Amino acid sequence: MTELRYAVRALFRNPGLTLAAILCLALGIGANTAIYSVVNAVVLRPLPFKDPERLARIYTEFPTYGSSGGFHKFWMSTPELLDLRRLTNSWTSLEAYTISGVNLSGGAEPVRVTAASITGGMLPMLGVAPQLGRLLGPDDDRYGAPLTLVLSDGLWRRAFGGAPGVIGRELKINGLAATVIGIMPRGFAFPPGETDPPELWYPQQINPNNPGGRSNHFQSVIGKLKPGITIQRAQAEFGQIMAEQGRNRTPHFHSFDPKFHTLLALPYHGEVVGSVKTAMLVMLGAVAFVLLIACVNVGNLLLARAESRHHEIAVRKAVGASMWHLARQCLIEGFVLALSGAALGLAVAWGALRLILAFNQGSIPRAEEIGIHWSVLAFTAGASFLTGIFFGLAPLAQFAGDSQESLKTATGRSTATRGAHSLRRLMVVSELALALILLVGAGLMVRTFWKLQQVNIGLDPARVITMRLALPQAQYTQLPAVKQLWTRLLERVNALPGVQSAAVLSGLPPLRPLNANDIQIEGYVKKPGGPDQNVDYDQAVSPGYFEMLHIPMVEGRAFDARDGASSNDVAIINLTMARAFYGNQSPIGRRIREDRDTPWCTIVGVAADVKNGGIDKPTGTEIYFPYSQVNGGIRALYIAVKTSGDPQRIVSAVRRRVAELDPSLPIAQVRLMEDVIAAANARPRFLTVLLALFSFVAVSLAAVGIYGVMAFLVAQRTREFGIRMAIGAEPADVLALVLAQGMRMGLTGVAFGAFGAFILTRFIRQLLFAVQSFDPLTFLSTAAILTLVIAAACYIPARRATRVDPMIALRYE
């Protein structure tokens, strides 16, 4: 205990240096722990299901079909799922789910929630257990069985106050009676990785005699491999199935085929986290650099402290202190320093993790599993301990010999050795190089985000608010009643004070699920290499939609009042579709239809492109229909309202108008159109902000490091500067001398950093948009920024050197 008290006193004889070392360690440990906790939960940790390594995501693909180079990782139709269950022997089970929004009533008030309809074996296959009640099983999934459902912990607590009595209670889902049979445990998320995760699960209850059309692809399929079966073996079996069906191929397009309609099985974990894996590993590399810079800074500080203690250690050794006693004291000081940094680092990690999760906005899958992971805290703390111990023992290196000789050496005014100076300079060069690598990475992401912001979405989102409304089929069985409600609602909303215009639409740009619907184009003959008759996106809208969002018509006209249910069917296509199927010819007056059972529609307009598959993706083909002429798919639509003032103020009035028509209908997903567009950029914005933050920390630490070294060197050369000025040197000469020394060190770090960035930035190439990994503007601007920081950090001690009084310096010596 006495040695511990002495260690604390010794450390705080120079409180500024000690606090700086603790802060450096805390920043490095805290940032590293926070990001590794995210990476560990999202990427490294297995999925929280039974035997997760045996789970696989199964897709169908159409490699040669469509107008955009084929459809990859596509959904499966229900008949295809039933076929696959019958034909394959590699899987213990093949289950499916579909995500949608549902109206849930029976609680305090109707709510719109995200739900997953699942096949009966899904939850048992995952090996999860409910916290209350039971799971959905095969009996619940039997066609015609009473409808049952399972609630998430969050929905149970939010809508029902966490009351156990909800088990057995009858609710209504989309107007159909359903009994609550179970509550899932807190933190359960299925499917994992969804931006808007389901809070309710109910059985699909597939009709075995009428499972739907083979071309109706909407099922997401997950399989569990039999023990001992690899995914490669299962894929090989898929190849046999495709080859057999391909040999017996019928004119029906949707038979499995090794060329036209393939099957693909991939590990489920990789499919859940694959979209963010690179970004997460980049973040882990970034914080590792921050930790390295922090440790280098601590090493520099402790080396400076070691040189200031030469005399103390030499005296103690001369009066009989053993090397073991001195080493033990230095070890204790190192442990105190590292423990303090680790403790503060834990607080930094906790705060950083809270900020990351708050700023997440759906950018990180499996966010519900993220928390402080103690193994990485132990690792980073251990690394810091080793750093502190190594440099804490550094003062003893020069005193391993004779005590009297050590004392003579230590009593000199200039105790720093050439080796110590070289090591210190090497450390500064290293941390500056690491800082520039981080700065370049952040600069590339800033450029990417800026480029994304400059992309023309194709519409004007100003003062537009959107909301989702769904009409349950159990209540609205007839399509004319559905269309009538939408028409009456639009009339009432358009009549509200402050509303400039209102419209309904089936899909919300700029990021929508792919439709990939077959179409028929009158007179179209496919040329070699030409597109198939298929459209990527379809959109049901009301008259006034194009005008409200300022979507220009390239040719023809927009929908208007003449395009009603009793009028001739019409359509509008986007410019991409016009070019794909009509080339340089005008499509106005040509006819098109979705399938053989629907009437022909006359194309009356060509609209400018609106982003539909993501801001960073090429615009897909798109066809618009008036909602009043559509025969299905319009029970759930978005309402878009453009106002003359703050759009948020109109929401309550719209709710009242909906309640006047049907009080059982909840409005959901109320968002400004500007926020919808911003959400499409959420992931690059998230990565940009974090990289910018880490690069700022890294540059700050590097600036502190070079400032500390230059200040120490100036202090060591006080006599030299005094003599120079005593014999006629001007202050400007001394200033230039010190700045030149610091800038040589700094520019060496910049050069090594630029080389390192050139090598490493290629690993973030897939995260960039419209920016090359070696972007000259980014490299030059970040190098210039770091050079200015270096110059500023060197100027302060250089300026101090010019103020040395020659007489005081000579008298000191």
Model-predicted regions and their roles:
Residues 14-42, 46, 293-295, 342, ...:
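Short, strongly hydrophobic transmembrane alpha-helices
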Residues 1-17, 101, 109-112, 144, ...:
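Membrane-helix entry/capping segments
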Residues 115-138, 147-281, 354, 441, ...:
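Mid-to-C-terminal secondary-structure elements
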Residues 1-18, 268-273, 301-328, 332, ...:
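Alpha-helical transmembrane segments of integral membrane proteins
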Residues 38, 299, 335-406, 444-448, ...:
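Small-residue-rich transmembrane alpha-helices
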Residues 47-101, 217-222, 456-518:
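Membrane-proximal extracellular/periplasmic loop immediately following the first transmembrane helix
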Residues 294-338, 415, 704-743, 750, ...:
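Interfacial "coupling" helices/loops that link adjacent transmembrane helices in transporter permeases
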Residues 35-63, 88-90, 129, 194-195, ...:
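Membrane-proximal juxtamembrane linkers immediately C-terminal to transmembrane helices
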